[in-house]
């Protein structure tokens, strides 16, 4: 008969092995995600204005999805041809410490050409995590998850899904999580191997179509997409607050102008804005359709910009964030 201490040691070893096996399968000991008021930062320079810092405090923002960099392609001079490279890296002009107790989620935008030319998706995953680590270390950011953003289609779905598996495996080894943005058209397919998704409720119609009234957000389009959809992952929801001017000439799309830019151009201009009533209508359209896996969803605003956010009252912002 074994000594009680030997039995205790045996049990401890078995529990440790089971935990390690769970790590290899991509499991985590506890969810890395919790519901919170959140907002995106989608600029190449991080330097929030006093208004934007006050917005974070006033509306009790606890999570900031901060775009770190894009993964594009470049022709390298080592004979290897096109290779994935980081581009449009965010420059930090201000310290994250100045926004208080806000969790920062690094976001990486993956271009389709980068997916297609990567030597291996495992090596791409390693490079992404290494760069996120370096940027977090340099800017004193402690992170618990990474988010990938990619406009994948059914054709490129296998590549992006494999990248998600590789990134998630590397993150779960460190007890960190992986999320991904999900566009409405992507809900028709199964979702990638992620811990949760963020459903992007903007750009719901084609901005290049001259006959569309408002391409940013149409609650009718959202309702139609959600009618026959049940997501197989937990989803949070991102709502737009931005505005823009679309330029057409001879019914052909020419480009996007920002409010304040010179609009003395030849052709037709269409002003579009995120409307509060459409945001609330979209919230009502999606809630009954999605699976609850044990914790409530978060509402997220896109994005942290004083010129756009100042168009909304404090009450309207509170209603957008209301569960």
What are these regions (language model features)?
Residues 236, 242-244, 249-323:
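Substrate-binding cleft of secreted/luminal carbohydrate-active enzymes
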Residues 17-19:
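C-terminal motif of bacterial Sec signal peptides marking the signal peptidase cleavage site
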Residues 21-24:
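Bacterial signal peptide processing site
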Residues 1-8:
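Bacterial N-terminal signal peptides that target proteins for export
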Residues 158, 162-251:
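Substrate-binding surface in catalytic domains of secreted glycosidases
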Residues 30-42, 67-199:
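Chitinase-like catalytic core of GlcNAc-active glycosidases
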Residues 59, 95-102, 134-142, 170-174, ...:
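A structural motif corresponding to the C-terminal end of an alpha-helix
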Residues 60, 133, 137-146, 189-206, ...:
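Structural recognition of alpha->loop->beta junctions
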């Amino acid at each position: 008969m074994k000594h009680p201490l030997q039995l205790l040691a045996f049990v401890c070893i078995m529990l440790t092995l089971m935990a390690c096996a769970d790590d290899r399968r991509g499991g985590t000991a506890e969810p890395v995600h919790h519901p919170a008021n959140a907002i995106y930062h989608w600029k190449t320079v991080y330097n929030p204005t006093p208004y934007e810092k006050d917005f974070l405090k006033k509306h009790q923002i606890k999570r900031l999805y901060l775009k770190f960099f894009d993964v594009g392609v470049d022709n390298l001079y080592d004979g290897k041809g096109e290779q994935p490279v980081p581009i449009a890296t965010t420059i930090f002009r201000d310290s994250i410490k100045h926004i208080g107790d806000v969790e920062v989620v690094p976001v990486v935008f993956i271009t389709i050409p980068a997916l297609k030319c990567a030597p291996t998706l495992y090596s791409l995953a390693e490079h992404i995590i290494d760069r996120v680590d370096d940027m977090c270390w340099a800017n004193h950011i402690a992170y618990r998850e990474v988010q990938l953003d990619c406009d994948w289609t059914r054709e490129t779905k296998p590549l992006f899904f494999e990248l998600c598996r590789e990134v998630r495996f590397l993150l779960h080894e460190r007890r960190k999580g992986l999320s991904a943005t999900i566009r409405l058209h992507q809900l028709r397919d199964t979702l990638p191997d992620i811990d949760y998704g963020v459903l992007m409720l903007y750009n719901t119609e084609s901005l290049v179509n001259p006959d569309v009234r408002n391409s940013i957000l149409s609650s009718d389009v959202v309702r139609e997409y959600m009618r026959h959809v049940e997501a197989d992952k937990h989803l949070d929801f991102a709502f737009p607050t931005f505005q823009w001017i679309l330029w057409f000439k001879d019914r052909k799309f020419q480009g996007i102008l920002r409010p304040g830019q010179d609009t003395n151009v030849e052709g037709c201009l269409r002003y579009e804005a995120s409307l509060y009533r459409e945001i609330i209508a979209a919230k009502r359209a999606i809630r009954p359709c999605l699976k609850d896996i044990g914790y409530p969803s978060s509402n997220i605003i896109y994005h942290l910009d004083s010129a756009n956010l100042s168009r909304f009252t404090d009450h309207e912002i509170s209603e957008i964030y209301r569960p």
